[in-house]
Design a protein with these regions (language model features):
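Local cysteine-cluster metal-coordination motifs and their immediate loop/turn environment
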Residues: 44-59
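Pocket-edge structural micro-motifs
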Residues: 45, 296-298, 398
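Short amphipathic alpha-helical interaction segments
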Residues: 368-380
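Minor-groove-contacting beta-hairpin "wing" of winged helix-turn-helix DNA-binding domains
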Residues: 393-397
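C-terminal scaffold of the Radical SAM
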Residues: 25, 31-40, 58-369
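N-terminal [4Fe-4S]-dependent radical SAM core
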Residues: 1-42, 90-91
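A short, conserved structural fragment
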Residues: 383-392
Length: 414
């Protein structure tokens, strides 16, 4: 999963080149962090077989009739990571997420090289969760066995639906039969598998939504991600909106999903995430708890904490530009020191997605700001019935989860 990143309130400063200017980030600043948050690594593979009309991620259709420039891109990823090392020196990496795009376009040898480079350059935890996204249209049994042997230990499969008509409407390259076959292959080699599905699809009925979810539940995978389809700006669907279920039907779908997944033994622990006991996505939990993540690859975002500041980075988005810049020692297009006034909203934007919320102490631990900096907002949200009144936690109520945007906006400074 790509992290939720708020739109910056000001134009970013010119990016320092990699870790050459690490001294800039160690100078005194507006905040005081007691310790570094946990660190994750996000790796972006930008190519897809075809761009989906609803997708606003940094993904690019692979050149027709040609292979992706795998070797050159892996060279660039290693160069990018090497340039970033001074910013994270000595910090253990707890999770890795290889997203896209479609990372399963990488060959078995390419994935093995990528993971070998990561292990050679970073102190990866022995039990690190290493997730790879995969598209059912790119599944080959032998290749996925090799991915597992290389060290991938969690697979996230972009199913979206098992209904052929809905898959066609979404512009997916696979059908329902391919989706089922992909899950069968995955479960032969992986015991930690997430299925991505969407609901409130074009022309979808409640009965069809139920059928999709029941099919997913029948596989008893460790994790499900169930997303309400939204029309994102700068997508084909935004320009040519399809006919979607009305709000009442979408809410009925959501209520049924929550009840049915709970009945099946899945815990709804985050806005769109459902897990069997102790099988939550550790990488995504680090995002939602406002942990740190180094992002490498075309268009990848990163958040890194220092004693007196929080740094956000973004790599060059176009794959060709990214590869050129990374090999020249300057993969980072934008970098900025997050203003202390923005940190409360950034923290809450993520933490309030969690059903259990977070310990109140985590606000200071991960923003470097005292909790009383948001006392008025906490009081207002509590008075509105959107936050649990327990002062030891920051936890949304059932009403707060239902009206999450309203709850988050309370913490948005004008």
């Amino acid at each position: 999963m790509i992290p939720i990143v708020p739109v910056p309130g000001a134009a970013p400063a010119p990016a320092p080149s990699g870790g050459d200017n690490v001294g800039l980030w160690l100078k005194p600043g507006q905040i005081s962090l007691p310790a570094s948050p946990p660190l994750s690594l996000y790796v972006h593979v930008p190519w897809c077989v075809r761009k989906c009309p609803y997708c606003d991620f940094n993904s690019h259709a692979a050149p027709d009739g040609s292979e992706i420039p795998e070797a050159a891109y892996l060279d660039a990823l290693r160069a990018d990571l090497e340039q970033s090392l001074p910013l994270v020196w000595g910090r253990p990496v707890h999770t890795v997420f290889i997203g896209g795009g479609t990372p399963s376009l990488l060959s078995a040898a390419g994935m093995d090289r990528l993971l070998s480079d990561i292990r050679a350059l970073l102190p990866l935890d022995a039990d690190a969760e290493i997730t790879m996204e995969a598209n059912p249209g790119t599944f080959e049994a032998e290749r996925f066995a090799s991915y597992r042997a290389s060290g991938i230990n969690r697979l996230s499969i972009g199913i979206q639906s098992f209904n052929d008509e809905h898959l066609q409407a979404l512009g997916r390259i696979h059908g329902g039969a391919e989706a089922r076959a992909a899950i069968d292959i995955a479960l032969r080699h992986f015991d930690n598998v997430n299925l991505d599905l969407m609901y409130a699809l074009p022309q979808q009925t409640l009965a069809q939504c139920r059928q999709d979810v029941e099919t997913a539940l029948s596989y008893r995978t460790s994790h499900l991600s169930l997303y309400h389809l939204t029309l994102e700006p700068n997508t084909l669907f935004a320009r040519f909106p399809p006919a979607l279920p009305d709000d009442d039907t979408a809410y009925e779908m959501q209520d049924w999903i929550e009840a049915r997944t709970a009945e099946a033994g899945y815990r709804h622990y985050e806005t769109s995430a459902y897990a069997q006991p102790h099988r939550e996505a550790r990488h995504n939990l680090n995002y939602w708890r406002f942990g740190d993540y180094l992002g490498i690859g075309a268009g990848a975002h990163g958040k890194l904490s220092f004693p007196h500041r929080v740094l956000r980075q973004m790599r060059y988005k176009h794959p060709a530009t990214y590869m050129t810049q990374a090999m020249a020692g300057n993969a980072v297009q934008e970098a900025r020191d997050v203003d202390a006034a923005e940190l409360p909203f950034e923290f809450m934007l993520n933490a309030l997605r969690l059903t259990d919320g977070v310990p109140a102490s985590l606000f200071h631990d991960h923003t470097g700001l005292p909790l009383h900096a948001i006392r008025r907002e906490l009081a207002l949200a509590t008075d509105k019935g959107l936050l649990d009144p327990d002062p030891s936690v920051i936890r949304p109520t059932e009403l707060g989860r239902r009206f999450l945007n309203d709850l988050q906006e309370i913490f948005l400074k004008s």
